[in-house]
């Protein structure tokens, strides 16, 4: 614990907690402090001017990161016949219908993204209480209920990141790894923020993107000047 505290103090040195850093400078500071023995995830946190308790202020969507997320994403697909074959050919890790339903009901959830063809949503709907709390329920708004199974699997494998505002009005997203070049991380962050801006709900009032911060798995949070990340 003492060693961990020393490492945290060292990581925080040289960071002004009150300063809003330009994105490039924030990433340079962050990458210099990623000293863990594994490839840390870089995360962005966005504070929005919304109250998600109101339906017209809910923010949800998906961002296709231009440089991928660096994660190995396991994809499950609910499909039958030709669409099941299409899913397998596209690289889906698990494909099925009633058999996949039974596997999940039995407590085995070995995937990070779930896709379904529209005709199987009545079947998938039975899993709402299992998949919903885990953020795995297929949803047409984020492209996971679709007949374009090939495209959905490719997007999931290639760096599509779903986002949903939390109760406090914050959105978190893993946008890459510490091993990514800083310019690739910056591109991913700007793409993610842009996707959140495009998902602005009709009920949002005042300043929509209020604060942005970046952090790593084991590193400090660094506040970012919103003008350096909001492209529109």
Swiss-Prot record:
MF annotations from Gene Ontology: rRNA binding; structural constituent of ribosome; tRNA binding
Keyword Calcium: no
Entry keywords, A to Z: Repressor, Ribonucleoprotein, Ribosomal protein, RNA-binding, rRNA-binding, Translation regulation, tRNA-binding
One of the protein's GO biological processes: regulation of translation
Pfam families in the record: Ribosomal_L1
Gene3D superfamilies: 3.30.190.20, 3.40.50.790
GO cellular component, one term: cytosolic large ribosomal subunit
Protein family (similarity comment): Belongs to the universal ribosomal protein uL1 family.
Main function: Binds directly to 23S rRNA. The L1 stalk is quite mobile in the ribosome, and is involved in E site tRNA release. Protein L1 is also a translational repressor protein, it controls the translation of the L11 operon by binding to its mRNA.
Subunit structure: Part of the 50S ribosomal subunit.
Name the record gives this protein: Large ribosomal subunit protein uL1
Organism field: Azorhizobium caulinodans (strain ATCC 43989 / DSM 5975 / JCM 20966 / LMG 6465 / NBRC 14845 / NCIMB 13405 / ORS 571)
Lineage: Bacteria, Pseudomonadati, Pseudomonadota, Alphaproteobacteria, Hyphomicrobiales
């Amino acid at each position: 614990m003492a060693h961990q505290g020393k490492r945290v103090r060292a990581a925080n040195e040289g960071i002004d907690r009150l300063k809003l850093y330009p994105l490039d400078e924030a990433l340079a500071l962050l990458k210099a402090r990623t000293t863990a023995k594994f490839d840390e995830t870089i995360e962005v946190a966005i504070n929005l001017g919304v109250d998600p308790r109101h339906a017209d202020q809910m923010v949800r969507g998906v961002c296709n990161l231009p440089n991928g997320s660096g994660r190995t994403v396991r994809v499950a697909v609910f499909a039958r016949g030709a669409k099941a074959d299409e899913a397998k050919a596209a690289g889906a890790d698990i494909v099925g219908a009633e058999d996949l339903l039974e596997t999940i009901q039995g407590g085995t959830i070995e995937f990070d993204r779930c896709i379904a063809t529209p005709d199987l949503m009545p079947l998938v709907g039975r899993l709402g209480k299992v998949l919903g709390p885990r953020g795995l329920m297929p949803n047409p708004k984020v492209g996971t209920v679709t007949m374009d199974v090939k495209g959905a699997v490719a997007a999931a494998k290639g760096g599509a990141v779903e986002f949903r505002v939390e109760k406090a009005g914050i959105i978190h997203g893993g946008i890459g790894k510490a091993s990514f070049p800083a310019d690739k991380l910056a591109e991913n962050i700007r793409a993610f923020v842009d996707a959140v801006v495009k998902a602005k709900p009709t009920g949002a009032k005042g300043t929509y993107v209020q604060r942005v911060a970046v952090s790593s798995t084991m590193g400090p949070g660094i506040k970012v000047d919103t003008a350096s990340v909001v492209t529109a």
